[in-house]
Amino acid sequence: MTVLKEQPPRLLRGTPLASKGLRKTFGQREVLKGIDLHIPAGQFVAIVGRSGCGKSTLLRLLAGLDQPTAGQLLAGAAPLEEAREETRLMFQDARLLPWKKVIDNVGLGLSGDWRPRALEALDAVGLADRANEWPAALSGGQKQRVALARALIHQPRLLLLDEPLGALDALTRIEMQQLIERLWRQHGFTVLLVTHDVSEAVAVADRVILIEDGEVGLDLTVDLARPRARGSHRLAALESEVLNRVLSTPGTAPEPDPVAPLPTQLRWAH
């Protein structure tokens, strides 16, 4: 596997993020209630919480798929809107076009001599040998690797992950976690991962943020060396701390279904 070429130093790669008084309402329901966050460049942040707590809404605001009712979203000192070209979003569904071969899915929307870059991105995720196959021939984990390659080809500074591993089997999920972590360490982009899996959050993130009823209920630093030994006492203790806090919070109604964006409005991992 290769590393994409011409990468600046790690700490210069990621987008620094901040939210100030971030609020979002749907009708009479306030889903986010004044979120204040500061995320340094290159940090790996996991966002957890019960269904309906507002975590997916927060990610959609960061991706520009919804607009906040109030508050600010910043990339450094500038509006986050100015960093959209350097932002990519991955979903649980890889969203590959079945009528395009793997390499063409990676290079979707690009012009010029993009094929060598697409092959390089596929090699970085271990799928260079599948470049000329159809998506239907791939497993679920392989499709998510293609989606990740589709993000890498754009050399993003901010990668937003909305439950991208939720549909994978346990072993494939761990392999994908390790791949995402390795690529993050190589390229230094900022990562925000929304997940229901507390063990996943603690295993891969620098920091775990728990959203409770639209507010930050817990902001926990995961100060453990990498690579992390799964099953270690310290990892289990941190997982238990977050999980106990999640379980102590009563469930809320599901977040409202957002209006699906048009393909031209959405920057997937492509």
Curated annotation (Swiss-Prot):
Protein topology in the membrane: Peripheral membrane protein
Keywords attached to this Swiss-Prot or TrEMBL record, sorted alphabetically, are: ATP-binding, Cell inner membrane, Cell membrane, Membrane, Nucleotide-binding, Translocase, Transport
Which Pfam family would be a valid example here?
Answer: ABC_tran
Q: Where in the cell is it found?
A: Cell inner membrane
According to UniProt, the reaction catalysed is:
ATP + H2O + aliphatic sulfonate-[sulfonate-binding protein]Side 1 = ADP + phosphate + aliphatic sulfonateSide 2 + [sulfonate-binding protein]Side 1
Q: Which residues bind ATP?
A: 49-56
What name does the UniProt record give this protein?
Answer: Aliphatic sulfonates import ATP-binding protein SsuB
What general EC class does the enzyme of this chain belong to? translocase
Q: Which organism is it from?
A: Pseudomonas putida (strain ATCC 47054 / DSM 6125 / CFBP 8728 / NCIMB 11950 / KT2440)
InterPro entries (UniProt xref)? AAA+_ATPase, ABC_transporter-like_ATP-bd, ABC_transporter-like_CS, ABC_transporter_ATP-bind, P-loop_NTPase
What EC number(s) does this enzyme carry?
A: 7.6.2.14
Q: What CDD domains is this protein classified in?
A: ABC_NrtD_SsuB_transporters
Q: How does it assemble?
A: The complex is composed of two ATP-binding proteins (SsuB), two transmembrane proteins (SsuC) and a solute-binding protein (SsuA).
Which intervals of the chain are annotated as region Disordered? Answer: 248-270
Residues covered by the ABC transporter domain: 17-238
A Gene Ontology cellular-component term: plasma membrane
Q: What does this protein do?
A: Part of the ABC transporter complex SsuABC involved in aliphatic sulfonates import. Responsible for energy coupling to the transport system.
Under the GO molecular function aspect, what terms does this record hold?
ATP binding; ATP hydrolysis activity
User: Which family does the record claim for this protein?
Assistant: Belongs to the ABC transporter superfamily. Aliphatic sulfonates importer (TC 3.A.1.17.2) family.
Q: Keyword Iron: yes or no? A: no
In terms of domain of life, where is this protein from?
Bacteria
Q: What is the lineage of its organism?
A: Bacteria, Pseudomonadati, Pseudomonadota, Gammaproteobacteria, Pseudomonadales
